[in-house]
Amino acid sequence: MKHSPAETCELLKADTFGHIERVQAGEAIFIRRDTRSAHWLLRGLARWAARHEARGLDRLRGIDGVPQLLRWDGHVLERSYIAGAPMQSAQPRDPRWYRQAHRLIRALRERGLAHNDLAKEPNWLVRDDGTPAVLDFQICWISRGRGGWFRMLAREDLRHLLKHKRTYCPEALTPVERRLLKRRSWLARAWKATGKRVYKHIARRWFGYWDDDGGALSSRRRPQDERGPT
């Protein structure tokens, strides 16, 4: 893809759904997701995912800790850059980080959005100032109301955060949080029993990547942060 002469681009990820790059134009730095390089069989799905992410980011405008939507033209999505390190690298152990992350999830819920992919550590950032941020809204759930389905998805977002807290800061878990961790929804049970296996098979066989953190095993995608990731 052609770039403006004034732009400096660093490739962050390239796969069958297109490519993602960090762009510097003058003093501005942003992230660009380009679906035009997607495999032709998957180009429609790639555009749908990018369009859905644009809708989610538009819903969340102004929330600190979420990328801000800059542009979506039907093929290319541009969003603001957030400096920080992914959870699996930063391994946050400060209880305050988890309280702030809980408030961030609550802010998403108040806008009628559930992230749906917070089990993946690369989707969490520890920013340079030590506060949390959330990335990758391609499969978020956008709701007009607060029905039972939405409430369940929002609880799953929180439960995934608590699982990360159990990994990196277990001594700070409260009795209420421990009880919530034990209360898996029927959706979580079904996903673990069937859906996760199917997803892992497809990710490995078709796209060449998967690990327990949602990271890639393919050489086409290397670990990054928002100095950084996607």
Stretches with model-predicted labels:
Residues 5-58:
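ATP-binding glycine-rich loop module of kinase domains
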Residues 83, 120, 139:
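Short, glycine/acidic-enriched loop or turn micro-motifs at the edges of active sites
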Residues 46-51, 55-104:
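Conserved structural core of kinase catalytic domains
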Residues 127-230:
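C-lobe/activation-segment region of protein kinase-like
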Residues 110-127:
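Catalytic-loop of the protein kinase fold
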Residues 39-43, 88-89, 143-145:
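A short acidic, helix-capping loop that chelates divalent metal ions and anchors anionic groups
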